[in-house]
Amino acid sequence: MATLKVSDSVPAPSDDAEQLRTAFEGWGTNEDLIISILAHRSAEQRKVIRQAYHETYGEDLLKTLDKELSNDFERAILLWTLEPGERDALLANEATKRWTSSNQVLMEVACTRTSTQLLHARQAYHARYKKSLEEDVAHHTTGDFRKLLVSLVTSYRYEGDEVNMTLAKQEAKLVHEKIKDKHYNDEDVIRILSTRSKAQINATFNRYQDDHGEEILKSLEEGDDDDKFLALLRSTIQCLTRPELYFVDVLRSAINKTGTDEGALTRIVTTRAEIDLKVIGEEYQRRNSIPLEKAITKDTRGDYEKMLVALLGEDDA
């Protein structure tokens, strides 16, 4: 469930564009007005506001926001105002500019989006960067990371609920044998993770637990803690089977470490507010005994804090 609260009475896009223009004029930017508008509009509404702003003022709203705002607040507003496919393309491109730690972002985009959402991200990547996402991922990665990540970002999974229980039994056995032999990079393991539907993967790993007496993630914990590929494999499985638990882990790490990881915090809130941030928040509170909103407000300040709280649906609007 989403946390985004869209206003009951939404003005015309031209009116929103005019109000945003007003927020940029004068001696100082009116950040509260910007939040009151953009943080309470759906992706489609934000898209139309951008179009109206461009038609009326001959400027790209994103460029104006970039010029008027700064720091973490600017990042949150810009990510939020982008269309979801554009946003994922940007996040993925940024990840290909960095090294190992960014592999998780590529995996996250590939595994927590629907097939259609991932396709839109790849199309947006083509349009924005004049090359393919898989091309940049292949260039950015090597070895086992390349095999896994290129397979994941090029995936187009069946989205239905139908599963083949015979296949689940066969592949649970196959995966168990590979894990037992520590062949974590086996092509069949990568094939299963990158081509099977999420329903089929869940059926396979449920059968794995039934047949072998422990969850697959528990089996993978027996590997080398310093093995970065194994860590990415664990995160991949978690994203495909229980994404809310993956996001809780990322949020907890982002908020609880010395010095907040605003990049991860902003990414999760802006990408999940229209999808399942309510479920993530409930799981966060269950596991950490503190509401997500309270954890965030303890570690953030100013307009950045106000924006995140608004996307959590916890402001007064």
Curated annotation (Swiss-Prot):
Main localization, broad class: cytoplasm
Record's note on what induces expression: Up-regulated by cold, dehydration, salt, osmotic and oxidative stresses. Up-regulated by abscisic acid (ABA) and salicylic acid (SA).
Biophysicochemical property: pH dependence: Active at pH 7.0 and 9.0, but not at pH 5.5.
Residue positions, PTM Phosphotyrosine: 129, 156, 284
Notes concerning its domains: A pair of annexin repeats may form one binding site for calcium and phospholipid.
PANTHER family named in the record: ANNEXIN, ANNEXIN D1
Name the UniProt record assigns to this protein: Annexin D1
